[in-house]
Every structure is written in structure tokens, then in C-alpha cells.
Amino acid sequence: VRDRVGSWFEVIAGKCVPGFRRDAPGDEEARPAKCFAYVQAHDDRLRRRLLPVLASQGYAPNQRVVLMSDGGDSVRRLLTRIGPEAEQVLDWFHVAMRLAVLVQMTKGACPDAGWTESRLRDLERLKWLLWHGHARHAVDAAEGFADDAWGMEEDAAGEAKAKPGRLHRAADEFATYLR
């Protein structure tokens, strides 16, 4: 979003939905979902804005809270402010976008068709692991992919080193993103 001065700022918006409880009595009234938004760079009182919304939904500081996010640093910082039981879940849209970029970079990184096909199979396996909820194995696979890209970068010489180098950096960044 752009303000009047011409600088950029980031808006964080969310919807707080109370969790489902199987053991809740049938006559218990469900709490409605509530929305919140704030501009992180301009709002130094995050706890005064967000925690009352969470508290109105029945949240206590020692309870588990799950945030679905794009994985940006601002949301990761938000987790540390909410409480020790806060957890981040990456949304599939942003994960799939990053995987698509890695696939395209892999196709152009190396003239060796065998290496490229093997890495594309690795990315398909990584995608499968993520889709099926095997986060720890997916992080290991992403780190292995980054190592393979690094190996290709080391073997290349001159101008040919640039594409594997970019692939290695992107793969390493993706592994960090998943952590």
C-alpha cells in the first residue's frame, strides 16, 4: 500500500476464528469470527490491538494459536509477540509459487539433461512431501536440493556459473523459508 508521502508500508490483516471443540456442550453458543488489521511500521502497540481480539475469542496467553501466513518476516516476528504457543502454518499458494520458480530455474540452470531431470524429480518429491504434511522431511529435501545446486555451481566455470549460483541461492532461501 502506498501512503501520501510516496513511501510503502505493509498492512497485516487477519481473521480470528475460534477453534472447534468436540467436548463442548451442545447449548454453548459459538463465538463469531473477528477481523483485525494494523500497519506494523506505524503501530508500536501491537499487543494492545491484537491481544484483545484474541482474548474476545477465548484465547489465553498459554494457549496454542495457529497463524496461517505467507511466511514473511513480519508475521514471524508477530508470532514471537503473541506468545510461546504460537505456531505458523504456511499457505499453499505461496509455497507453490516458490516451487514453480525453482522448477523454472532448474530447467535453465544446467545443460546436462540427466542432472536437470533428476532435480525436477527431487522438486516433485518435495512438493509431495509438503502437500502431505511431512514438513521435517520436506525441509531435509529442500536442503538436499540446495546442496545439489551448490555442487553444480562448483562444477561450472565462467559465465556458466551464474545460473547454478542463482538456483543455489533460491533453493537455500526456500529451505530457510520452510523452517
Model features per residue range: what roles?
Residues V1-R179:
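Catalytic center-proximal scaffold of phosphoryl-transfer enzymes
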